[in-house]
Regions:
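Acidic/histidine-rich catalytic neighborhood of metal-dependent amide-processing enzymes
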Residues: 133-233, 258
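Solvent-exposed loop/turn segments at secondary-structure junctions
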Residues: 54-56, 85-88, 106-107, 117-121, ...
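N-terminal capping segment at the start of a domain
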Residues: 17-64, 75, 284-300
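C-terminal motif of bacterial Sec signal peptides marking the signal peptidase cleavage site
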Residues: 8-11
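Second-shell loop/turn segments in exported
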Residues: 27-35, 50-59, 86-89, 131-143, ...
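A non-catalytic alpha/beta surface segment that caps or lines the substrate-entry region
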Residues: 43-106
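Active-site-adjacent substrate-binding region
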Residues: 93, 207, 214-321
Length: 321
C-alpha cells in the first residue's frame, strides 16, 4: 500500500459517501465480549514469519499458503482457494492464491473481513540502500492482519453471530510500483476477487473491513480517508467501540491520510469498506518506521495491540443486528 497526503475531514460531512451498511453494531448498550486472544493471534503471526518472507513465486509463499489454507479449513467447512496468474506492473507473472472462508453462509446479511498475506519483494524504504533489493519479512505488513483474521475465524467457529462473515486472505497486494504513477499496481489479488467470485452463485457481502499493519507495539489507528468517505458509520462505530473497550489510545479519534490499499478495490466494486491501518502523522512515509524495511520483524509485534484490534472487531461483529 502507499499513503497520500494527510487530509483533514474534521467537520466535512459532505465528503462522505451515502453508502452505508445494512447491518450495524449497537453501541448504546453493553459491549459484546468474545474471548479474543492476543497471544493466539501473535502465534499465527509468528507461524507465518517462520516460513520466511512470503513473496509470490517463492517456496516460502507456497508453504505459508498451504498453512493458511489448512488453518481456515480447521474452522470452516466452506473454504475456497482461488488460484490465478496475475501480471505485475514490471511484467512478472505472479502465481497468486486467494483464500476465502465463509462462516454461516445461509445468513442473508454478511460482512467481509480481509487481510493480505503476501510480502513485498523489496525493502525499498530501508535506511540502508544496500538492502533495498532484499525481501520484507512482513510481520506487521501482512502477517499481523492475517493473524487477527485467523483468531476471529477460530471464534466464529465456536460462536454464532447474527450476521454471516466471509474472511478473505488476499494475495499480491504488495508488488506495487512506488516510483511510478501507477496506483493500480497494488492489491492485485483483491481486484481480481472483487470482479471474479471464488465460486458460482456467490453473493458478495454488503460491507467490508480490511486489517493491515495491526500489530506494532506503538500502533496508531487513524480514520483513513477512503474508509470514512465510503462508510463513515462503520468507522465511527468501530472507533466508539474501541474507546468503550479501553483502546482509545490506539484507535485515535483523528483523521489520517488516503491510503491505496485493498479496501479501495472493494469500494470500487460497489461495496463499502474500511481500512484499520496503522498511520503516523509524524512519519515521512505516513506509516510506522519498519514499513517496507528489513526491520518489519516479530520483535515489533505486540500481543496487546493485536488484542485491541481483535476485541474491537469481535465486539462489532457480535454486536451487529
Amino acid at each position: 500500500m502507499i499513503a497520500s497526503i494527510i487530509i483533514s475531514l474534521t467537520g466535512c460531512s459532505n465528503t462522505k459517501s451515502s453508502s452505508t451498511t445494512d447491518a450495524t453494531a449497537d453501541t448504546s448498550g453493553p459491549v459484546p465480549r468474545v474471548a479474543f486472544s492476543g497471544d493466539s493471534a501473535y502465534s499465527y503471526v509468528e507461524a507465518q514469519c517462520s516460513f520466511g518472507p512470503r513473496v509470490p513465486n517463492t517456496e516460502a509463499h507456497r508453504r505459508c499458503g498451504d498453512y493458511l489454507l489448512a488453518q481456515l479449513r480447521r474452522h470452516s467447512s466452506a473454504v475456497t482457494e482461488q488460484c490465478v496468474d496475475l501480471r505485475a506492473y514490471d511484467g512478472t507473472t505472479l502465481k497468486a492464491r486467494n483464500f476465502v472462508a465463509e462462516f454461516y453462509p445461509d445468513k442473508p446479511k454478511r460482512i467481509l473481513l480481509l487481510a493480505h498475506w503476501d510480502c513485498r519483494p523489496w525493502a525499498d524504504s530501508d535506511a540502508n540502500a544496500s538492502k533495498h533489493r532484499q525481501p520484507v519479512m512482513g510481520a506487521n505488513d501482512g502477517a499481523s492482519g492475517v493473524g487477527v483474521a485467523l483468531e476471529v475465524a477460530r471464534l466464529l467457529a465456536a460462536n454464532e453471530p447474527t450476521v454471516g462473515v466471509d474472511i478473505l486472505l488476499t494475495d499480491a497486494e504488495d508488488w506495487g510500483d512506488r516510483e511510478g504513477d501507477s496506483e493500480d499496481s497494488w492489491a492485485l489479488g483483491t481486484r481480481y476477487w472483487a470482479s471474479n467470485p471464488h465460486r458460482e452463485g456467490y453473493v458478495y457481502p454488503t460491507s467490508g473491513i480490511l486489517l493491515d499493519m495491526v500489530g506494532d507495539a506503538n500502533a496508531q489507528f487513524l480514520k483513513e480517508y477512503f474508509s470514512y468517505r465510503s462508510d463513515a458509520k462503520t468507522v465511527s462505530t468501530l472507533w466508539a467501540l474501541a474507546a468503550q473497550l479501553g483502546h482509545g489510545d490506539r484507535f485515535v479519534n483523528d483523521y489520517g491520510g488516503a491510503i491505496t490499499d485493498d479496501h479501495v478495490e472493494i469500494i470500487a466494486a460497489g461495496i463499502p469498506c474500511i481500512d484499520i491501518i496503522d498511520q503516523r502523522k509524524d512519519s515521512p512515509t505516513g506509516f510506522c518506521p519498519q514499513w517496507h524495511t528489513t526491520d518489519d520483524v516479530m520483535r515489533h509485534i505486540s500481543p496487546s495491540t493485536l488484542a485491541a484490534v481483535g476485541e474491537t472487531l469481535t465486539a462489532y461483529i457480535f454486536g451487529m443486528k
